[in-house]
Amino acid sequence: MPPTPKPPRLGYVEKREWEQMEKSILVAERYLTACQESAADPRVAADHKAVRARLETLAAAQAKVDELYARWASLEAKVKA
């Protein structure tokens, strides 16, 4: 009977990344909240260029948070394997 393959484990770099992931997500979420508040600022509502820039920054911040959660899930799956 062939040996069963070992489940993937975290390497050194991935382990350190996983250990710091919660902090990274919290920082990214704080930045996302700040971007949301900035985009909702009524003082810039009349300036379409400023609104567009803030919305682009907001979209990038949301993408970063989503990316971090996806990476965390990937690392978590390896840890639990």
Residue ranges and their predicted role:
Residues M1-A81:
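Charged, heptad-repeat coiled-coil alpha-helices that serve as long linker/dimerization "arms"
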